[in-house]
Amino acid sequence: MDRHLFLFGGGPPFTSKLAKQFAKQVSTHGGKVALLILERANWQEYMPKYTNTLMEQGIREFNYIPLPTVSAEEASRILRNSSGIIIGGGNTELYAEFIVKTPISKVLKEQFSDGVPIAGFSAGSLICMDKCIVSAKDNADQVFKYQAGLGLLKDTVIAVHFSEWIEESHLRKAVTLFQPSLNFGIDEGTGLYFLNNKLIGREGNGVFRLKNNQLEKIEMQL
């Protein structure tokens, strides 16, 4: 099965063309989307930011999985019955704790391999990688951190909120440490679409990469 991965450099919403592409893949699997998010006060009020652009594309069924309130077992059941999966933004280390380090991770990998599209926003994008790399600007200790991710995209490192947080030095550190084949700095309001581990389109603001030790902007559009 084709594997569809959407990585956004900030919070929701989906960009318009990527929303259309995500919804297209969801519809081929039945049309039901699950949202993995962190439990926080009034979280329900924030959900339309994720769902409105998909509703415009005809998606009507959404199942919300606030963690850790919903158990890993119940979350896994919902995910197995989903046609598309969104991993939200927030505290990256908590997303890793409640998803990567639990049985939820196995279900996500299985669904992804079976062709169910997965979209990550900010922290959700970071945990999709083989190495979940957390910026010093994104944790209480204010240090560069990394841990295992879901491994949906391998041999690649990313930095999110790239221009907004001035993250070139962070991306350089990640590239130097892990020597990946590919690297991307993704701005807010920007998404990348990977089909079978290959970048085939982007939409939104800036996407950057380090090539021959020089930072360059990627101009590809969807």
Which residues make up each language-model segment?
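C-terminal and late-domain segments of enzyme folds
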Residues: 1-28, 38-54, 134-222
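Structural motif
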Residues: 6-7, 84-88, 119-120, 158-159
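Class I S-adenosyl-L-methionine
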Residues: 39-77
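Flexible gly/pro-rich beta->alpha loop and the following alpha-helix that scaffold active-site loops
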Residues: 64-117
